[in-house]
Amino acid sequence: MPTTYRIHPGVGVARLGNSPDAFCITPEQPAALPIDCDARGNPLVTPDGTTELTVTAFKDEEGRMKRQAARFQIWAYDDESPNGRPLKLGDHIEGGGNAGTLIDIQWRVYLANKKSGWYDFLQLQGEHGYDPNHPLRNAAITDTNARQRLIIDPGPRTVDHQTNRTAHFTSDNDAYATIFPPPLKPNSIDTLGDLLTDDTGRLLVLGGHGNSGSYLFDDEFGQPRINDYANNDGWFDDTSDGPVMARLVMFSPLVQSVRYVDVEYPAWVVCAYPAYVPEILDVVTMDDVIEDMAIRQFAERTDLYGTTGTFDDPQRIAPTDEPALIHWRAGRLRWNPDYKPWFYRDIWNILYRPDQYNYLCDTLGQSNYPHNQSTRGSFDYEKLGCPPVIDWEAVAECEQRCINAYHSGDLFVEELKAELFPLETSVAGAASGAANAQPRLLTEKRAGKLRDAVAKFARNAIGKSPGKDFDDCLQKWQAASESAAEAKEKLKHEVDEIVGADSAYPEDVANLLSRRVHEHLQKYLSGQLLRDCRRKCIKTNTYDPYGPMRKYLFDLLRAPGEENQFMITGRPDSRVHGLPRMPLLCGDNPMTNELPSKFFRLTDFQYYLLRQWAMGIFYNEKLEGWADPDPLHPYAGWINRTARDLDRGVISNILGGSFCPGGEIGWVMRNPSIWLEPYRIKADRDFSNFGETAAQASAAGSVPDSDYAFYAGEDLSQANDFVTGLQPGDLTKYMSVPWQADFNECSTQTIDVTYEKFNQIYPASDNDQLMKRQQRVWETLWWPAHRPMQTYEQVVPNDSSSITWLDWTPGVPQTNTGDLKMVTEWWRLSVVRSNPSGTVQPSPMGTPGPSQVPYISVERTKRIETKKEEQS
């Protein structure tokens, strides 16, 4: 394969911070701490140089939140490295008919914020296209040119390793006519971030400083107002997103000159709010969402999900072959019923995540025990990870009985009796009022004749003795059966005579009997009865003491299509009857009656994995000796061996739902139309590419930045064009403005569960007292791993005994007033991280004490300290 070059991660994440200079690097593994670095973006490493160090502080010396940079690098793909390898300065590269040494990397990034000029966010409206009458944000501004001013557009920036290592997305750019908001309150916006390259040529993208403000502040107090969790006219924030492109610079010894090679396709960067709980993942991460989409929309794992009958030889379809994918999606698709997930790799992490929410909110702490990892709880990984055990010696003995009974005809007759019993019962019931009772369908005489006929056929087919090896017997049987066409026809004729002899039944019953017997005979001839007998042997000799525990947890899950169902009903004899479905989190729309989706659910792929596990179809890799996982640190062993590992490691730290509108980015991410392939956004090349092609740059020898980097042939669009691709700002524009409003309110939601299809009911309109008395609501969490409710916090420095359970946002209520407070309070909030002096093992009774708290809030910026700093 020709060498290709790609940017990874495909989607990078930068995070806001109000520290003017201090920053770190976003984690590149799931549930990890940020990577510590120096002022030039070079990671700090262990003395042996093998491991990057993580931060010990999330804030600078003055208590201001550090920004987190998204880091990008180039990976090379060729025959030696089909899964990619990191490319380094000094490596040999090829492209454009040239070959040489990599001496530099030019990076081009274009950030923008389109929130204020986009549509109002109204829950799920717009996910499948916007109604022509859907309201716009800042709808009072109607002129197209005027609305263009609602887009924050600093233009593209470029950096490289040799001559221009930093760039800034500021309003004062001589080479590009930028668009920034007018003066705002409480905070104006004059930058969307910065670029820099480290000493190895990798790119770091830093986002904004968390500034949000409105130009509408002429109320009686001279202050802006927030009236909604998602849509607030006049407001802007400095979140952003956009494409990341790279060009390789080589020195070609053949021509003794510099030549240029573009990477295959752009990556994307999202600049979002801080990660306050970096070591606890969401129940569904963005990686889970994209993985599910990759499997069900892009045919990426046809060994797991594909056309019926193809799992032994999975289809292979390129992710960019749209006609083939459309044809595949229209087929008979299903999940592979025989696939065995690994417990610690695939199952335990799904169960582990919600259990960690106990340390982020009061709600679970009061109601969820002993639903935890203690030996008394239902989340005991040693029990849940114990697969069914099969007594293979007993199975072998049972298989021998199957073989002998198959050869003698006993199995044929016994299974036929069981198959005819429902029909015989039905016929007997219909004839119960008749004067003469009907004879049995399969009399002993008839059964004996059938047994003899089948046994005779078996002796002729495979000999007098069936042997003792089950697989060998089955193979010989199938081979003989396929070649004995004349003998099979003779047997079928003989069976016809036996079944039809002396029949005292009406013609319709006799015909039905004949059909059933011949269907059964076909199972016998094909070997199906023998295979079924083996399955029964295995099932009978399988010991699964923890199967009921697995099934109980699975039965609690909210299946696809049950997003509006609160409790499990209709199963009064079940242990789960009357219990709430899980996960008990808010869905994509628990607020309005337009496209309601009250509660959250797992992805289809996660649900499938847990279904296999519940049925006992899984491996425990620890028991098998394949791995030695740490159940209490399920991601500790994550290593980015491939570029896909890096893609997944980064994006796993982004919220994967619910999307109302969501965390960093929203429901647009599950739309396959915005993806070139899984983990790579389809980009509008007019806004992602360098102004000149690599060939033009090679012909010119060198091209200054200003000659091509800042050229713009058209404005950033105020509409979508998924065929062409996404432009800068097209991912974050769906999110709330300012981001602090939705972030503050996504703590809990009161969901009306009275009726499945209605989020809002109005008993007062009809004076319906019965409806009012029967009305039920449930206070439901949104996503505590992003926005905690309560946390453990050490209130006295250096005194672990002072650890106390406190509200995470004291003085900031879940109201519009609280939303406005959050605009200036967000950076003061504490960060929840693993407790260095604690233990992750809960106490035997399930309620952790101070010394057993696994997560603790740190670095809360106290107001009194800030005042002292300002005075000094």
Feature locations, PLM:
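Aromatic- and Gly/Pro-enriched helix-to-coil junctions and flexible linker segments
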Residues: 1-463, 467, 473-474, 480-872
